[in-house]
A protein has these predicted regions:
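Catalytic-loop region of hydrolases
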Residues: 21-134
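Alpha/beta-hydrolase active-site loop
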Residues: 189-212
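Accessory cap/linker subdomain of secreted extracellular hydrolases
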Residues: 60, 256-364
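Short, surface-exposed "cap/lid" segments of acyl-processing enzymes
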Residues: 116-125, 129-167, 182
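Short beta-strand/loop motif that positions the catalytic acidic residue
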Residues: 368, 373-380
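C-terminal motif of bacterial Sec signal peptides marking the signal peptidase cleavage site
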Residues: 14-17
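C-terminal catalytic histidine-bearing segment of alpha/beta-hydrolase fold enzymes
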Residues: 348, 353-355, 359, 379-382, ...
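Primarily recognizes the serine-hydrolase "nucleophile elbow" in alpha/beta-hydrolase
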Residues: 204-276
């Protein structure tokens, strides 16, 4: 009886907190345990967004660097991104925060049920970020960018996309297999079908949990969003929803800097004998081999020093991508791969390329139905701009707005992308009929 009274009290607090705009502390973890819900909260905290920009440890996780690049419009009439005036990652992030310096967010880390690469049941983790006060407008389902250390997993930090919470949106951000509670497993990097399934399973777990908590959004359509690895993944999530007629209404998809053609992206490392982001070479290879259960011996393709340190540098989840790049110590692809790994005609590489092709969203027999905003910097030094041009050619009949231009390197492009999405969301608030201002 006492337990039921506590649950009723919690629900009352949630209802008043989510809909009346009052700042009330609610123990979501206690509620999730009491109700035996689909999403079990393991940690909860409230974060002041302005404090983030003054936190050097948080900033350094996103590779804060200076650059002299300035946004320029591309040729061919493609619209430029909404411009942030700063030319540094830290500066653009500050501009993101300046929209609402007093904003606060409630972070809920938790676990949910999904499946692994063998289709066996597994518990995965992720984070939900809610406005600390006021109603929730819509959900934004985020597919995160490439990470390497477990401390970068969304359940363990405040993800960069989480800054959008200040506009009144609730963000759902899965960790993926290999991070969070499954950090002991190899991450099936860029294996699209399973990752899209894992992302959607978190959405299906979180929605009924928040409904029980009285925190349903004002609108029942959602946004999808992702940059880099997340850009390709969010398109795979859109495909999963539309191809299988899942009961999710997509308002718009925001995709930035994505490797939509995985084989082409990887092959550029081989063709140019240069990898500006060297950790991507072993991470992509391992993701394809493990995630697709290929019968390949990676030691025949990876240079011995890379293969021998793979578990320590990559699979331990101790190091960030920047730290792994420093440990690798070279950007010359032939120093990362064996002659067999550099030989596109070898049996091993042919099988690897086949898996990459099958996981490339551009090889799917599908055209996006929901509106898409696609962003890519022509200066991207990690994911070649050609990916975006191939997407534009493949999906020429789709409802896609393109934003291509000189927006800086891959990292700066990420922050500009989020800045642009924020501007589009603000426009969307004013134009609920679906017409977006650029």
């Amino acid at each position: 009886m006492k337990r039921n009274i506590i649950i009723v009290q919690l629900l009352f607090l949630l209802l008043t907190g989510c809909y009346k705009g009052e700042v009330k502390y609610v123990d979501f973890a206690d509620l999730s345990m009491a109700e035996n819900t689909t999403f079990r909260v393991t940690a909860q905290k409230t974060t002041n967004l302005q404090d983030l920009c003054n936190d050097p440890e948080w900033l350094n996780l996103f590779g804060v660097i200076d650059t002299t690049s300035t946004p320029q419009a591309n040729v061919d009439g493609i619209r430029p991104a909404q411009r942030a005036t700063s030319t540094s990652v830290a500066g653009v992030m500050q501009e993101l925060l300046d929209f609402s310096k007093a904003s606060a967010a409630v972070e809920l880390s938790g676990v949910y049920k999904s499946v692994d690469i063998n289709n066996d049941p597994i518990f995965l983790s992720g984070k939900v970020i809610l406005p600390a006060q006021g109603p929730i407008k819509r959900y934004i389902l985020v597919s995160h960018y490439t990470i390497a250390s477990n401390k970068e997993a969304p359940s363990n930090i405040f993800s960069l996309e989480g800054l959008l919470v200040k506009l009144g949106y609730a963000l759902i951000i899965p960790d993926y297999i290999g991070y969070g509670v499954t950090a002991d497993k190899v991450h099936p990097y860029l294996v699209m079908e399973i990752t899209a399934r894992n992302v959607l399973d978190m959405y299906y777990a979180v929605v009924p949990f928040l409904e029980k908590a009285g925190c349903s959004p004002e609108h029942d359509d959602i946004y999808l969003m992702g940059y880099s690895q997340g850009g390709a993944t969010t398109m795979a999530v859109q495909h999963e929803i539309e191809h299988h007629d899942q009961p999710i209404k997509i308002r718009r998809v925001f995709a930035g800097g994505g490797p939509y053609d995985i084989k082409y992206t990887y092959d550029q490392f081989v063709e140019t004998n240069w990898a500006s982001y060297p950790c991507a070479v072993p991470i992509m290879m391992q993701g394809m081999v493990v995630g697709n259960k290929l019968n390949l011996d990676m030691s025949t393709m990876m240079a011995s020093n890379i293969y021998e340190n793979l578990d320590e540098w990559v699979n331990s989840k101790f190091y960030t991508t920047n730290q792994i790049n420093a440990l690798i110590g070279t950007k010359v692809t032939s120093d990362l791969l064996t002659p067999t790994g550099m030989d596109r005609t070898s049996k091993e590489v042919s099988e690897l390329y086949k898996a990459m092709t099958e996981n490339s969203i551009l090889t799917y027999s599908w055209t996006p139905k929901a509106p898409v905003f696609m962003f890519h910097s022509m200066d991207d030094d990690v994911v070649p701009f050609e990916n975006a041009m191939r997407a534009k050619s493949k999906w020429k009949n789709a409802n896609i707005q393109y934003s291509f231009g000189h927006y800086g390197n891959h990292q700066l492009g990420c922050v500009r992308f989020i800045y642009t999405v924020q501007t589009l969301l603000k426009n969307d608030e004013k134009e609920e009929n679906g017409n977006f201002n650029f």
